[in-house]
Regions:
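Helix-loop-helix hairpin linking two adjacent transmembrane segments in secondary transporters
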Residues: 124-125, 133-179, 183
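Cytoplasmic helix-loop-helix junction between adjacent transmembrane helices
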Residues: 93, 99-137
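Intracellular juxtamembrane helix-capping segments at the cytosolic ends
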Residues: 109-122, 306-320
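Paired small-residue
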Residues: 83, 94-102, 291-299
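Conserved MFS/SLC helix-loop-helix module at the cytosolic interface between two early adjacent transmembrane helices
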Residues: 55-93
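Extracytoplasmic gate region of multi-pass secondary transporters
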Residues: 203-245
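Helix-to-loop junctions at the C-terminal end of transmembrane segments
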Residues: 56-68, 254-266, 350
Length: 383
């Protein structure tokens, strides 16, 4: 029972990693409250944590030298919760603005640790299974907090931020059930000044490029599917929302299927899932009816979850314990870069054509090519 609770507590850390955008449904109320402030500045509050996440990831190596993994996790969980209470205490725009940056930094502290702690504490098949379930936990967490916002918003937009108080029970679970003895502290101290070799840097950077491409494609799908739904099936925003929700929830199945897929494809899983992901994007671009569009979009969500989890699994396989946290932070930084680059890529492609066949044709072919690059990285680093 103790081991089960330890695993549940570790997986709970991933429950809140992708919840920065959960308060987006409170934007309308925030527009009304902050009259005189441009809507673009209010919308910025939703995406602002991404900047804080980037700061934490960039300085992760130096932060890791000053603080233990346990200190970073506890600090991240406490800051995460406090930033949820700040709008209630002071809803002034500059205060909320600063709190969202700090919120992002807290998520950044948790992001690397939540992934690395699994690779450090579990080995073999158990590690693969746990990494897969970790991806499912992210999906469930985002859905639960988004639903929580919809319930709290009736009490005012400030109350919607209280969903971030979920980190308090997660903190208690972590402190109660995840052991941190003198042996763990000694291992961390031993690895604190270990530096990555040139080969390890190349592997981590290569996988960061793969992760960036995977996330770039996912955000492109999320942003463009509503307009494609209208063009292809004369659907509504509600229809697009249902398709995108299904695309997210299929990530739960992908997480549960990850271990069997790893056993089946072994070191080829990254290229198999990446090529499948690219093909689904090509099919999105040429979909002629709503049913076909819905099916291939949901399949894209499955392939996306498998491909991204595979990146972290490869890192766990290839990187020694002393540099795993730093290598993971590089890969997560790649994910953030891919997300941020989406707007610029779509704008650039839009200067040529905004047709779905062109947009998703580009992203699909890019994903397939990057998948073979990923296979080369995996096999080269495995020698």
């Amino acid at each position: 029972m103790k081991k089960i609770m330890e695993k549940v507590s570790i997986l709970a850390l991933s429950f809140i990693l992708t919840t920065s955008f959960s308060i987006s449904s409170a934007q309308s109320a925030m527009f009304a409250y902050y009259r005189g402030i441009p809507h673009s500045m209010i919308e910025l509050l939703v995406s602002l944590p991404s900047a804080g996440i980037m700061v934490s990831l960039i300085f992760n190596k130096w932060i890791g030298r000053l603080f233990s993994e346990r200190q970073m996790i506890v600090t991240g969980l406490v800051a995460y919760a406090l930033c949820g209470f700040i709008p209630l205490i002071s809803p002034a725009y500059p205060v909320v603005f600063l709190s969202r940056i700090i919120f992002g930094m807290a998520v950044g502290l948790l992001n690397v640790s939540a992934i690395a702690i699994i690779s450090e504490r579990y080995k073999g098949k158990e590690r693969v299974q746990t990494l897969g379930i970790r991806g499912s936990a992210e999906v469930v967490g985002t859905a639960v907090l988004t639903f929580g916002v919809s319930l709290l918003i009736r009490f005012g937009w400030q109350a919607a931020f209280l969903v971030y108080g979920i980190s308090i029970p997660i903190l208690l679970l972590y402190l109660l059930f995840v052991p941190y003895g003198s042996m763990t502290e000694a291992v961390e101290e031993k690895h604190r000044d270990v530096k990555m070799t040139g080969e390890q840097w190349r592997t981590a950077l290569g996988l960061a490029v793969v992760a960036a491409s995977i996330v770039l494609s996912n955000v492109m799908i999320t942003v463009r599917i509503p307009s494609v739904v209208e063009q292809v099936g004369h659907g509504t925003a509600q229809t697009a929302g249902i398709i995108l929700a299904a695309m997210q929830f299929v990530g739960i199945l992908a997480g549960l299927a990850f271990s069997p897929l790893t056993q089946l494809f072994r070191d080829r899983l990254l290229v198999v899932s990446g090529v499948a992901y690219g093909l689904t994007q090509l099919l999105i671009g040429v979909s002629t009816n709503l049913w076909m569009l819905a099916i291939v979009t949901i399949l894209a969500g499955f392939a996306y979850s498998v491909a991204l989890t595979t990146v972290y699994n490869v890192l766990s396989d290839q990187m020694p314990a002393g540099v795993l946290s730093q290598a993971t932070s590089i890969a997560v930084l790649g994910c953030s870069a891919g997300s941020i680059a989406t707007t610029f890529v779509l704008s650039l492609l839009g200067t040529i054509s905004s047709a779905p066949a062109f947009i998703f044709g580009f992203s699909g072919i890019l994903m397939i090519l990057i998948s073979f690059f990923g296979l080369w990285i995996v096999r080269k680093s495995g020698k």
